[in-house]
Swiss-Prot record:
Recorded name of the encoding gene: mutL
Gene Ontology CC annotations of this record: mismatch repair complex
One GO term (biological process): mismatch repair
UniProt keyword terms in alphabetical order: DNA damage, DNA repair
GO molecular function: ATP binding; ATP hydrolysis activity; ATP-dependent DNA damage sensor activity; mismatched DNA binding
Protein name: DNA mismatch repair protein MutL
Keyword NADP: no
Compositionally skewed regions (Polar residues) per UniProt: 370-381
Top-level taxon of origin: Bacteria
Amino acid sequence: MGIQILPPQLANQIAAGEVVERPASVVKELVENSLDAGATRIDIEIDKGGSKLIKIRDNGSGIPKDELALALSRHATSKLHSLDDLEAILSFGFRGEALASISSVSRLTLTSRTAEQTEAWQAYAEGVDMAVKVMPAAHPVGSTIEVVDLFFNTPARRRFLKSDKTEFTHIDEWLKRIALVRGDIHFTLTHNGKTVRNYRPAMNEPQYLQRLTQVAGRQFADEALRVECQHDDLRLSGYLQSPWSTVLTDTHYFYVNGRLVRDRLVNHAVRQAFAQKAEVEQPGYVLMLDIDPHQVDVNVHPAKHEVRFHQSRYVHDYILQALQSALEEAGELGFEHPFEPSSPQVRDEVSLSESGTQTQTEHHAFELQSPESKTHSTWNEASRVDTSRVEISRDSQLTERTRDIASARPYSGVQSNAYGSMAVPRESRSGPTGESRARAELPSKAAIASYGELLQTPSYSVQDKPYQPVLAMPAMLNGQYWVLAQGQNLSLLPIQSVALATRSHEIETKLATGLIGQPLLMPVSIAADTDWPALLEEHETLIRQLGLELTIRYQQLIIKKVPPYLRDSQLAKVIPEWLQSLRFEAPAPNALAVWLAEQSLTGFTSAADIWAAYSQLTEEKRQQIADKAVSLPWQSWLEEQAIE
């Protein structure tokens, strides 16, 4: 048999093998065309699971009479005209083959009218050459497409269809997915003359929560954590199943620029964010990612179920950090079950009493902001650092330490900021009243694990020791020395050396159990030396103990996680220098502590901060530091003056 061009109908039927898998595929393609046409209402009518009839009616812009014949032709589209358009596509359809493929395996009729036309026109294709015939019809502005007897001319494909109930279930499931991302559209779904779904437009948050309840169930909607995070050209929004929920759900929806996709990247990010936090192995989520269309390729799958990100690692880490931030804030509130079932349009308020002040918190769905928008807490009058909405203060009259509502571990009365800076006592903090307070005092294992892995305020293992009040700070000389008086002796203690010794002691204590690494939003890549792979393998335990995550790929060292003490360092310079030192010998714990302390002294913002941290040390350790003070021979000087 020689090479020949296939007849149009046969070519379309072959293409339909990829585009039209089952009735749900037809509904998907036609509804997406309606959305691209700007429709605000779409009515879907199904008969016998879609094998007998699929009818889609919308109020979109319609198709002009002159373009109706082209609409049923292969590779005819209004969505793009050049390669540049394809590289920045935002519409659902763009290949121009759906209508031609569907019409080749069914009896398809397209009726449409634009606002500029006084009458509607109807088109259908028939015959081996798929010739399109156009005739006048009655129809409002918009389009209606009828697909009758799907696969009537391909018996083999028709035999593979499941029961009417199963095929309709696939249609219903797909409509749920599109209804979540297009809350502004009114969808109706009818099967065998009976209205099954009626998704009214959701123009505000309570209405959208009602739609979320219809699609994902009341329990998911009532317990969901709201995710809202933006960084540069990336924006992630949606809802996340509560980590305290034990209910299994099949709500796993991820959208990229409004397009529903299946992506292993987001599944991995969700599982990693929920590691040791969730009661279920695969938590539910409805997440919508908005990204520059130039940074994503949607033309990689025949049915457009998958996309390819140009910077997949960057997107993965962004999603991971956004979800971890959401879980952090939920964990900080300390509720065993932070949501009570309620009407989707009613939000309960929980009154949190802190230092006599009542704070009203809406908890139907927490709106979790990006790290940049979090409020800052006051350490002292001279400094402010981000501590993820947990207020930490120091006053002249320090109150007795109390248990933090987000942790059930013994508490030492000190807290480190996000960059491992000085530790100061925390004021007494009262939790919620009533039943919520009881739950706050006895959080679940998931809540404890969540608190232990906070990104912005990392938790370290703390010894259960009695609280030590802040000592009276001595006088300062030139802002660089403290003047210590011991009996008749005076000495100068360099403030910088106290900061270094205090931080070193803090780090050395925590190195015994290992530091907690924080994921970088943007991993740092450095050209790797040839012997670095061997160094990483040889000192793997030490690297893990420091909270570092280092990998080598394509002769590049990739820094993914660092301890909080290195967050403000020039990682591209500091990490290679440290790796160079490993070539000679592994440093002792005290040397490591000094090195990390030198990198993180910027966390101290004032002498008062340093003295507060110094006051928390044991008396023996304070004495060791004070012994390094330089004595002032002031008595000898006085005697010399008296003689003169």
